[in-house]
Structure formats: C-alpha cells, structure tokens
C-alpha cells in the first residue's frame, strides 16, 4: 500500500499551500461535499484535470457560510477564477425527502452531518464570493447548476425559477461533465481574455443583453419561450422542455436562447462525447482514492459506498423520464479502455482494507459498456432521447462481449476474489433479440455470467411500476419483461444451486400514476412474493421530463394532459400500497380500496392470511442487516410450481 503525504492531495488550507511553496493559486474550487480525492467526486476530477494541465488548484470543502466568511478568505484571490461545485447531488435532494422533511444524514459529509451545507450552495457561495471579491470571475459547475441552466420548476419553493445565473450572479455555468470546457476556459483566461467576452466555448451558459446576443458560430439557434411567458403559461414551459432534452442528446445540437427580463440566457451546445483516450486520461489522474487526511477517523457514507467500486463508462441511453443522467452526461456511451480499468482495479487491490471483493464494476447503467450505434451517420441525425424506448433502436449494437471480457479480465487479477455488479441492470437489453446472432449469444452468456459470478446474493433491477400506462410515462419497458427476466433469473439460480434474490425498485406518485395503479402494483408484487423495501415517492427534480409533466400537467412531447398526485395526502395514499404486508397498514388500505370501488382487491391481498411462524430472531436480524438493498425476506422469492416447498435461504457466497 502506498503511503500518501499531505502534499499528495490538492491543498485545502494556507498551511498546505506553504508545504508546496505556493504563494498563490490559479483556481480555487468551493465544494459543498467533503473532499474525497476520487474520480467519483466532481471537485476532485476538475481539480486533478487542471493540475495535470499545469495549473495550481486548491479546494475549499464545505466552507462555513456564517459569520465572518473566513473560509472564503483564507486562500485569498485566485489568479483566474473561483469555481463553485456544490456537490455530487442536488443540495435540496440531499437535504430533504420527497415530503420536504429534513434528512437525518448527509451522505457526502463527515459522519453524515447534515448541517455542513446550506440550501442552494451554488447561490450562497457565489453571493459571498461576489461580495468579497467582486472583480474575480465565478464559474458554476456540477449537477445543481447544470440542471438549473434554464427556467426550471423548483419543488421545494413550489415555483418556477429562472436560470441560476440570475439568482447567483455568477459569470458562467459549465454544464455536464466539465473537464474539456474548464480546460478551455482556463486557457482563454490565461491568454488575457475577459470572461464576459468568452461566448463560444461549448457546454457553457452565460447571460447576454437581449439586444446584443453574440452570433452563433457553426450552429443554429432555438429560441425558447421566455421565462416570463412560462410563468404565465404552463403549456409554454412544457413546450420548452422537449427542445432542452433533444438538444442535450444530439450529436450536433443547436444553441438555446431564453429571454429573462432584459437578459438572454445563452446555452452553447455540448462538446462531442469524450473519446476513450480522453476518458482514460481523466480516470488515470493521480487520485489517492481517499478522503483528505483532515477527515481521519470520520466516516463519509458516500465514500464507503464507492470505496471498492470502479466506473467503466460514461453516458446512458436509457432515457428514463425521471433521471437527470442524459441531461448531464448525454446518451452516447464513452468507454474506458480495458487497460485503464485494470489499472484502477490494481490500485483498489493495494488498499489496506480491501478483502478481495469489488462492490461494483459498472456505470450509470450496469450493462451498456461497448454499446452504441452501428451506423454513426444515423446517430448524427437522431433526435430520440432514448436508444431503447419505446423500442430498442435497430441500429443499436447490443453486444455484451466486451463487457464479459472486462469482467473476466478483472476476476483474473491476483487479489480479486469476486467483482460484484452494484449498478442497475437493464434487463430489456438482456432479453432483446436482434438480427445479430452473435450479440444474442453474448446476451445469454452475459446473463448467466452475471447471475453465477457477479451477484452478491441480491441483484438490483428497476421495473419502477407494473402499470403499462405509467411505464410509458417513465420510458420503462413493459412489466412483462420483468416477469420474463425474473423467470430466467430463477431458472439459472435453480440450475446453479443458488439462492439469490432479485431486488426490484419501484416509484409511487409518478406522473400518470393513479391510486388504482398502485393498488394493482400491490397485488402483482404480492403474487410475485415480494415484500418491497426499495421504494421511493417521486421527487420532482429540476430538468427531467417527469418533473415538467408533474408541474405543468402536460406531456412535453404530445402536450396531452397528464395526471399527477400532488398533495401530501394523495402521495401518501399511493405510497401506502408498497407496504400492504405490514399489519398496521391494512385498515387504511382497505378503506382506500373501498373508496376506489376496488374492494375486490382486498381478497387478493389478504386471502388465506395466517399467522406467520415465529422467526429465529438472531438469524432474522442478521438477514435484515445484510438486506438493506431491498426485499425484506428471510427466504428466497423464486417462482415455484404449486405445492413445491420453498428452499431455505442461503447467505451470500
């Protein structure tokens, strides 16, 4: 194990600058997350990228925004700009539940403390910096700013908000994965350009006077409905989102313009997807993969989750309506080379507390590595936000062969016992049968490889609902495909003598979901022998099609009306059906079903109910502790022929 010195981390204090003999830095990054020097943490990625290009970079993690602002003063002024990177999650999702209740833990803070970040740190940090150093440019990045780059609905304020540049008074947003635009910005500022004159860097957002918008270079413009129009007309807001989503996922996107008062928000098209060499260069930077030494003895929950995981690609072509990944990373997959992946795995193997098991070898989705369009010219003209919904594109290469090779190459390394897959598996890709028989054989081979060797007892998948009308709104495959995959999963388990569980994820209160749909979900999952635990109430987050439908009441593509459960009472009534098996929920559910006129479902949920036998509580508690990911069962939930007894559950191999 390599011993790291304090100077192996990016500096966070004046003392650490002195150790490097630096009297000044080029860029200072302010982050609302703890500083973890790991490629899964955005501030570390940008900091290491700039460092590799020869710039001096410092990070101020979780500054105190109260009192005399000493954390904002301690490193002085940077030569080029302040970067505000609020964190890996939207701050309001991080702090509050779907019912707007304060969360008890912040996964990105030491010991899970929830008082170390403000609401909207993008705005709070920027306003402080502008107050202290009005002449120094402030550049925003990260998920919070990226998803608020245009007029958006804010669930926690329950109103539309303009581009976050208007509220924060920052100079620029770098949206999405920011290595390339950040490097280009540094280069321009280094050459003496004023940030107000830099208007042509891809993947940036800035405000211009409405009567003096710079001419687009090499692209067309799409003029969106103004912020003021959207405030008055929800349909206009819905119309905007179709353009926003399409331009976020095109090979050759248009520039977006939106008027806000006397200003115009200008969103430049994104950079093309990174090449494999470029992505390798980002992941191969000298990360220590450790929290900064200032956190010694403290637990950072998010780091513990990804400590022994390795990311193998960027991008996701699933296009799920409630997900921000396509708007942030795009739908085109960029893969790391096998050599780069193995290099990082070897680094994990050297960690002193690594016991031989990788917790995840995946990405935004588990099984999209190596996939993309066969005919690239067709992809260049494509406007679909998803390559697999409503049907899998016939141009998509769904061959899993490269991914199988990655798994086997990793498992062959000395020091690796098992590599598990913690990312969500797209079972629709596994079930799909194309005209390419080699790809079909690889899908079958991958499915067996996955279940036999890469499941740590429980496999996570995300059907999200059972009602096809809701699944269409979510852009998820029909529920029958989940049934088909579960049957395949159970068959392979039986053939291999395994006793694994499949853990389905579900969402309530999604646009298009009525209470009766949730009642049907309860009955169907009960018939499949699930006691659901991995569930969530839909939370409207900025810049997703689901949020736009929830707020406006319109489908942004068809402009047809869409129902959404909005009041807390409606949302709780939908959520209760997840927990039909809890005795304390039965009376309320029965009352709700009768009010719906669906008393027939009562018998389906509780027919032949009998007292469960007393469990061995020692074993039961142990099982519950292991089973934080979902189905709270003490036995496996495979489908069995009538009359066949359930096999006893066996712990993880």
What are these language model-derived features?
Residues 2-24, 34, 235, 239-309:
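N-terminal [4Fe-4S]-dependent radical SAM core
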Residues 90-99, 147-149, 179-184, 211-213, ...:
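Flexible glycine/acidic-rich beta-alpha junction loops that bind and position SAM and/or redox cofactors
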């Amino acid at each position: 194990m390599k011993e790291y010195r304090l100077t192996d981390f990016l500096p966070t204090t004046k003392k650490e600058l002195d150790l490097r003999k630096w009297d000044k830095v080029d860029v200072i990054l302010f982050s609302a997350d703890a500083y973890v020097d790991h490629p899964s943490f955005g501030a570390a990625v940008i900091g290491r990228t700039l460092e590799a290009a020869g710039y001096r970079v410092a990070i101020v993690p979780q500054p105190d925004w109260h009192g005399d602002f000493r954390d904002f003063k301690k490193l002085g002024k940077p030569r080029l700009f302040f970067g505000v990177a609020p964190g890996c999650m939207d701050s309001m999702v991080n702090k509050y539940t779907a019912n707007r209740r304060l969360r008890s833990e912040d996964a990105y803070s030491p010991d899970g403390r929830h008082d170390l970040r403000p609401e909207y740190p993008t705005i709070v940090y920027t306003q402080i910096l502008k107050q202290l150093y009005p002449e120094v440019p402030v550049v925003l990045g990260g998920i919070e700013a990226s998803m608020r780059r245009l007029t958006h609905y804010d669930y926690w304020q329950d109103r539309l908000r303009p581009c976050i540049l208007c509220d924060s008074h920052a100079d620029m947003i770098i949206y999405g994965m920011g290595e390339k635009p950040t490097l280009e910005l540094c280069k321009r500022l280094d050459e003496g350009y004023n940030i107000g004159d830099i208007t042509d860097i891809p993947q940036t957002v800035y405000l211009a006077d409405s009567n003096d918008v710079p001419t687009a270079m090499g692209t067309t413009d799409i003029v969106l409905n103004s912020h003021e129009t959207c405030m008055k007309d929800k349909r206009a807001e819905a119309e905007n989102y179709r353009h926003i989503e399409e331009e976020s996922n095109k090979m050759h996107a248009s520039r977006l313009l939106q008027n806000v008062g006397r200003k115009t928000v200008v969103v430049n098209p994104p950079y093309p997807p990174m090449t494999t060499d470029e992505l390798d260069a980002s992941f191969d930077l000298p990360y220590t993969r450790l929290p900064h030494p200032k956190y010694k003895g403290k637990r950072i929950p998010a780091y513990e989750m990804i400590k022994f995981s390795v990311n193998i690609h960027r991008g996701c072509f699933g296009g799920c309506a409630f997900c921000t990944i396509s708007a942030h990373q795009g739908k085109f997959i960029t893969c790391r080379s096998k050599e780069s992946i193995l290099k990082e795995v070897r680094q994990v193997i050297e960690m002193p507390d690594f016991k031989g098991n990788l917790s995840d070898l995946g990405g935004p989705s588990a099984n999209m590595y190596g996939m993309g369009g066969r005919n690239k010219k067709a992809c260049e003209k494509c406007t679909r936000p998803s390559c697999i919904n409503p049907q899998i594109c016939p141009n998509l290469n769904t061959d899993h062969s490269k991914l199988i090779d990655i798994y086997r190459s990793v498992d062959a390394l000395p020091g690796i016992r098992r590599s598990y897959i913690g990312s969500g598996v797209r079972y629709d890709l596994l079930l799909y049968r194309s005209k390419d028989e080699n790809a079909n054989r690889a899908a079958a081979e991958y499915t067996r490889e996955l279940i036999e060797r890469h499941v740590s007892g429980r496999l996570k998948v995300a059907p999200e609902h059972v009602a096809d009308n809701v699944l269409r709104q979510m852009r998820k495959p029909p529920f029958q495909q989940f049934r088909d995959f579960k049957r395949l999963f159970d068959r392979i388990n039986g053939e291999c003598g395994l006793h694994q569980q499949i853990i389905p994820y579900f969402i309530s209160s999604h646009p298009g979901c009525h209470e009766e749909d949730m009642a049907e979900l309860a009955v169907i999952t009960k018939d499949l022998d699930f006691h659901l635990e991995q569930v969530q109430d839909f939370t409207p987050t900025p810049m997703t099609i689901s949020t736009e439908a929830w707020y406006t009441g319109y489908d942004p593509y068809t402009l047809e009306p869409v129902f959404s459960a909005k009041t807390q009472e409606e949302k709780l009534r939908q959520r209760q059906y997840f927990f039909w098996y809890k005795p304390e929920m039965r009376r309320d559910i029965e009352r709700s079903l009768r009010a719906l006129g669906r008393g027939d479902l009562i018998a389906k949920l509780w027919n032949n109910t009998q007292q469960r036998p007393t469990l061995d509580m020692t074993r039961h508690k142990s099982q519950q502790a292991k089973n934080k990911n979902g189905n709270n069962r003490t036995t496996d939930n495979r489908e069995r022929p009538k009359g066949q007894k359930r096999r006893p559950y066996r712990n993880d191999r």
